[in-house]
Amino acid sequence: MRLLSSLKLFIIVVLLSPTVYAQDSGFKLPTDQLKFGVFIAQFDPGGTFKMQGERWPPLNGNWKTTGDEIALTMSGGAGGCSGPGRYKLSKDGSKIRFDLVSDECEIRRIIIDRSSWSLASEVKTIPERTIKTSAGERSPAKKAASTSKGSWPSFRGPEASGVADGQNLPDRWDPKTGENILWRTEIPGLAHSSPVVWGNQVFVTSAISSDPKATFRPGLYGDGDASKDRSKQRWMLFALDKRTGKILWQKQAYEGEPLEKRHIKSTYANSTPTTDGRIVVAWFGSEGVYAYDMQGHLLWKVDIGRIDLGAYDIPTYEWGPASSPIIWNNQVILQCDTQADSFLLALDGSTGKTIWKTKREEIPSWGTPTVAKTATGPQLVTNASNYIRAYDPKNGQELWRLGGSSKITAPTPVFADNVFVVVSGRAPERPIFVVRPEARGDVTLPEGKKTSDAIVWSMTGRGSYMPTPLVYQGMLYVLANNGLFDAYDLKTGKEIYRQRLPLVGSGFSSSPVAADGKIYLSNEDGEMLVITAGEKFAHLSTNSMGELLMATPALSDGVMYVRSVSSLFAIGRKSQK
């Protein structure tokens, strides 16, 4: 059961090129070795097959095709499978696809059902993805404005820091009584995307389902299942007046049935929008990238192809994207780590045309990239499974890479106090890395080493799975999904404290933010905790929002904007209104 439980975490799809087929009485299978994620298979023309994958027991046996079906039997009942399994074969574009007809063997069914196989010799060949750009209602936008005071332009704010001092936020608030609630506006649909702020506008995205019962499943669990919701969606971008909560405009970017599935804990609008005060950009995965001016006029839209993400070695699980776009120097930058065709992409913010595109040998990841100003120049840093990487954002050229991450990565890199902090939280690795921006080349640590010229310090077993870490006032805070909250000295890595947070409930997906010596934490059940920053843990208050919380708050001009499952709240002292 432990093996089967661990199987519910992975996915990869790879491409297939034409080859010579074996002669048999049914569907023609390739004679060469095939690859599917971490699995290698050989279907011998004589009727035997071998299938093996990293950390999996080998599956060997006999095969026979009849028409468009294949029957598989295991030698000696290997893997506890004595009966045959039957699968329908089809061409999936340039791939060979297996779809379940009947099979009582669970391990075989998990591996094979809905799988698409490629020639092993062709897996490293990454094809060009077609990117289609369309002009919108207006001519290209003006030159971008400089960062506005009080802006929170992307996920976790400037440089993904999550910090905005000078807010004078309250410690306590109550939506039921209205205490320190400036306004609350209902937002239709489902979304885990976070709010962003520029000037007097707050932007949020959503996906409105045609099924009124569409939902997601919060909580701490290991299931990797995709949601059964494939209902027709309307992907939306909303602009609200940040002073009153009034919806200023709303735009439908796309309508239709989703091209990809989503995780049962996910939505079809996970990616946070981004803005530079000139344009606001929303990315809806396979449904496209959309850029609007600040009045809601569509400037351009780009189809970057299928964005297929999921568990890295069980391709039947589709989880959907969560990485968010960022804007740097009029470039819209996207991190697209998918099943077979991973890349970084920089689009012209004025036209949507490709400025540069860098291919990546990566499995799916969900973190948002970060661009930071360093003493050695700007760096674009990405968190992913094979390597943490830094690039020159001007041209997409790689500057350095660091191995040792978890197989599933979601937190966003953070730049603070002249170091990059990058973590990931899937066992067994769960690393924390603190990296100097002067790093160049491959700076992967040799086994057993924790530091180097490039790595200030590192550790394993303490990285967070979903929440992005927080660097504040010389300390690093790491929040685990299960409510363990760790504090470290940023310079040395010394543990200051480890605290089990109260009211863990369904767990934590939202990332912590900080202002004026206080840290704000949101659990999925809708409880917001306020604690003091510093070497001593002190819990100041717990504030119930009465609704599920998955998104990360935004801070701007004395107000904290909190996105719940159904609403957007503005929290601040009444004098801020």
Residue positions per predicted region:
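Lipid interaction determinants
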Residues: 21-140, 144, 243
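Bacterial N-terminal signal peptides
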Residues: 8-19
